[in-house]
Amino acid sequence: MLTYAQAGVDEEKTARALREIIRTARETFKLRKGKVGEPGDIGHYAALLDFGNFYLAMTTDGVGTKVLVAEAVGKFDTIGIDMIAMNVNDLLCVGAEPLALVDYFAVKEPNEEVFKQVAKGLYKGAEEAGVAIVGGETAVMPDLINGYDLAGTAIGIVEKGKVITGERIRPGDSVIGISSSGIHSNGLTLARKLLIPKYGLDYEYEGRKLWEWLLEPTRIYVRPILELINSVEVHGLAHITGGGLLNLKRLTNYGFELEMPPIEGIFKLIHENGVPLDEMFRVFNMGVGFIVVVPQEEKEEALEILSRHYKSYELGNVTRELGKIKVKNYGITL
């Protein structure tokens, strides 16, 4: 049995270590008090800066150790998509339309072919998300970096009065999940350390090599979510990233009662190799990359809209059991 913490990613330890940085960051808010760009609070998927009639939303994220898989097989043309996806999907969670992005690419040494492949993925991701890449930083640091690191910072815009934070979520609301493309960009450290030493990257599983499962690009949800929020009342939006279903606790203190889709593909292989079910749902997206919460009366229209883009599921409902996320069909409470 291997857990995420045993693989080297202890999220509780990280949260404790971050407390001082978050406290200090909040102290800087007073520097913009009463000025254009005054920030809201820290903690949601994206920060909100006050620009009068609208908020500028801002977020930052990276691809993580998925880059190590790309490096191992010499295939870098999809990690740019991952970086765009990780950022724009977070912007969507406050109801913002993504506008632009800057990238940060740290390397041991410049390689023209690698740069060309990364650029290809960045363009494809930007095209899907409808954003402009307006700048960036390439850092060549042979004494610090042993391979590659790719991250970015994105901005979006949302009108005041249209911000979605989860505060309107109520017991009885419907919970809808949009399918993921696979592992996305979270839990790769656990997946790599569990599977690669045992099988190797060329291992065939259900018709695909292991590296193909691991490098499948993160799905970009901009089109379905923007269509949704312009069509129905939406109470909450959650990008299911690191922490799995625990991300729902970022939206509300209310509980959730869900039935998740069957465990398939890469998640099935990981579970079969000893990762317990509760850990699976705490680490991976488990086939659902994005979750929306809508009033019951909006459920059918929401499902119709989302299903036009990607396979979507009616997962369950919001409950009055504070802080409890129940996955009924697997007998798990998170």
Curated annotation (Swiss-Prot):
Pfam families: AIRS, AIRS_C
Nucleotide-binding among keywords: yes
SUPFAM superfamilies for this protein: PurM C-terminal domain-like, PurM N-terminal domain-like
Pathway in which this enzyme or protein is active: Purine metabolism; IMP biosynthesis via de novo pathway; 5-amino-1-(5-phospho-D-ribosyl)imidazole from N(2)-formyl-N(1)-(5-phospho-D-ribosyl)glycinamide: step 2/2
GO terms under biological process: 'de novo' IMP biosynthetic process; adenine biosynthetic process
Cell compartment(s), UniProt: Cytoplasm
GO molecular function list: ATP binding; phosphoribosylamine-glycine ligase activity; phosphoribosylformylglycinamidine cyclo-ligase activity
Reaction(s) catalysed by this chain's protein: 2-formamido-N(1)-(5-O-phospho-beta-D-ribosyl)acetamidine + ATP = 5-amino-1-(5-phospho-beta-D-ribosyl)imidazole + ADP + phosphate + H(+)
Record-listed E.C. numbers: 6.3.3.1
Keyword ATP-binding (UniProt): yes
Keywords: ATP-binding, Cytoplasm, Ligase, Nucleotide-binding, Purine biosynthesis
One cellular component (GO) term of this entry: cytosol
UniProt similarity note: Belongs to the AIR synthase family.
Protein name: Phosphoribosylformylglycinamidine cyclo-ligase
Source organism of the structure: Pyrococcus abyssi (strain GE5 / Orsay)
Annotated gene: purM
